[in-house]
Design a protein with these regions (language model features):
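Non-heme di-metal
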Residues: 1-132
Length: 132
């Protein structure tokens, strides 16, 4: 349980870092952020009802997909933007560690259809946020 509390604190750090960096770059957050947060919380709560192994499997798969998403951003960021790169690399490292911790603590690999639904949902979220 300790690792989940620590991971939650790191996720909060990530949100703060991203908000700060967006402000520095005169960027803006997606208007959908509250919806994404509420949806993610709800989905996490649903998976939590299936027991610890499934819940940890959900954490593992979520973090794996976040790592892939961060890698895509890292490939697009100008090498001159060292501050953003550093933030994303730190986030990537944290997310990868969260996935590994979920496995080490008994996470059960999710079934392929569940992984595909998660991937599709993430794609809808990221593409919608990018355009609105």
């Amino acid at each position: 349980k300790e690792h989940l509390i620590e991971a939650g604190e790191e996720e909060t750090d990530h949100l703060v870092w991203c908000k700060k960096r967006l402000d520095e770059l005169d960027g803006k957050e997606s208007i959908f952020n509250p919806l994404w947060y509420a949806g993610s919380f709800t989905i996490g709560a649903i998976f939590g009802r299936y027991g610890e192994k499934v819940s940890l499997g959900f954490v593992e798969e979520t973090e794996k997909q976040v790592v892939i998403h961060l890698d895509k951003h890292l490939n697009k960021i100008s090498l001159k933007d060292k501050e953003t790169i550093e933030i994303l690399q730190t986030m990537r490292s944290d997310e990868d560690a969260h996935a590994q911790q979920a496995v080490e603590n008994g996470g059960e690999e999710l079934e392929i259809p569940t992984k595909k639904i998660m991937k599709y949902t993430a794609k809808v979220m990221t593409s919608t946020s990018a355009h609105i």
